[in-house]
Amino acid sequence: MSLQFILGNSGSGKSHYLYQQIVNESMEHPEKNYLVLVPEQFTMQTQRDLCAAHPRGGIMNIDALSFMRLAYRVFEEVGREEQPVLDDEGKNLVIRRIAGKLEDDLKVLKGNLKKQGYISEVKSVISEFVQYGVDFDKLDDFMEGLSQESYLYYKLQDIRKVYEGFEEYLRDRYITKEEMLDVLARAVCDSELLKGSVIALDGFTGFTPVQIRLISELLKVSEKVIVTVEIDRREDPFIYRHPYQLFALSKQMVTSLVKLSLIHISEPT
């Protein structure tokens, strides 16, 4: 396994270079799977770009996928039956129901529940808690450092109650799309699609902890993982000091991937 970074400024041709590399390798190794992972909104355009880069106009052993589409592909392959996935609209309905039941116990949220878009904001906060691994213990630890008379303390206390009710409702019924990547990470080792494949990640400015855990598993089974990184050529991508330095997100992404495990790092391009 190896990890390769393609570095460059915005508009420098990183994606074009990557797609050309993937196309050339796929023609030399038609027996191998090549997976290009991009943000959900870019999957269709990436498929078009790959087809345009291919001299035959087709991509038989190349797939352009998002993380979620990769999850469905792997689940279909390994025959893993998972609980139904609760989409964003479903989460809004569940959270509205739970908040309604808890209304008398809520101090801050109580007066805002009927405001347009407020439930959606609460849903977004809970989704980020899941993505970034903020469980109840971490939330409690953070709240202990706050004044118990502060607005933020009461608001987090309300969100914690709704979050707990949301988790209890989902248990043994549904999983969220944020949790799907953890399920996928556990299925990676059983997938023939992923074993010995070349996986490219393009168009990301950073990765959430759950995505990092998945990439860690992908590195174990794939032949190579290639990541495009937006950064100035004068910057050292392997030195991340603080979140306010230039290209901090890119440097944080690079250093977090390097730290995943004992990985051979291909020469930057």
Model-derived features with residue positions:
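Conserved P-loop NTPase-based nucleic-acid remodeling module centered on helicase motor cores
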Residues: 31-138, 147
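Glycine-rich P-loop/Walker A and Walker A-like loops and their local beta1-loop-alpha1 context
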Residues: 3-29, 33-46
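Accessory N-terminal region flanking or inserted into the helicase ATPase core
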Residues: 2-6, 14-17, 101-203, 210, ...
